[in-house]
Amino acid sequence: MSRFFWVREDDDVAEQHGGEVHGAHKWKLPGAKCHTCGITWSGAGHTYPCVDLSALPEQQAYERARPEPFIEFARLREQVRSLAPAHAPLPPGTRFGPLVGTASGNLADFAWLIDVLLMHRDALERLQALHPLGLRGCRTELRWRKKNPPELLELQLEPHGRLHPDCIPSDVPPPCQTCGRFALSRPQAPILDGASLPTDIDLFRVGNFATMVIGTERFVEAVHNLSLTGLTFRELPTR
């Protein structure tokens, strides 16, 4: 089996470059007030920057972050489902469309905005030439505070695989049957469920903990071969 690595920001490199990105995605699903578990919530890590909602008649309903009763949330979700990847779970708070905001200073080849992974276009094209699977860059709408700014793209990282049950505490309740909320904190020693991991994509999010980004050995080797900056890698066990 291929080796898998937890991909995170290289804080030291980011600090050395000193650049910053601020923004939010153009559209999003509302949060949900669940009538079953009683929780009002919105998830993180589910972002589809290449999905365009501009043709929807109710486009404005996706422009403002807010909570809605679960029934209304589910109605709005169904309107975008055909535009999103077929396997996408689309929980409350899922974001769509370009990242809109500002950027300044110098950035590493890979740059992060919380759970959003950005990349310079030229670096992405060099990386794609080494043929890692499934890398897709999406346009951003970032205003730069300098002349001749670089072009930053956001990588669309879709959820695949899951954490193995052995690293999930036994007292964590199962996901809500209505809204899907899974009240799991990130395990200190994550283990990936080997049988669930994809074989046709080299960079993805963990399906049941989407703020974790995972890269395959092929992706990590390509990044190292090109000496691209901005990422750290920690190998994770599979079971």
Model feature map: region roles:
Residues 117-124, 212-219, 223:
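Short coil/turn motifs at helix boundaries and re-entrant loops, enriched in small/polar
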Residues 49-90, 188-214, 221:
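Short microdomains enriched in Cys/His and/or Lys/Arg
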Residues 34-37, 176-179:
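Short cysteine-rich clusters marking metal-coordination/redox-active sites
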Residues 84-106:
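A glycine-rich, hydrophobic loop/mini-helix early in the fold
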Residues 112-113, 117-158:
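Acidic (E/D-rich), amphipathic helical modules within compact regulatory domains
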Residues 14-27, 156-169:
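Short, intrinsically disordered, charge-biased short linear motifs at domain edges
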Residues 38-41, 182-183:
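Cys/His-rich microdomains that often coordinate metals
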Residues 28-31, 173:
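Residues immediately within or flanking Cys/His clusters that coordinate Zn2+
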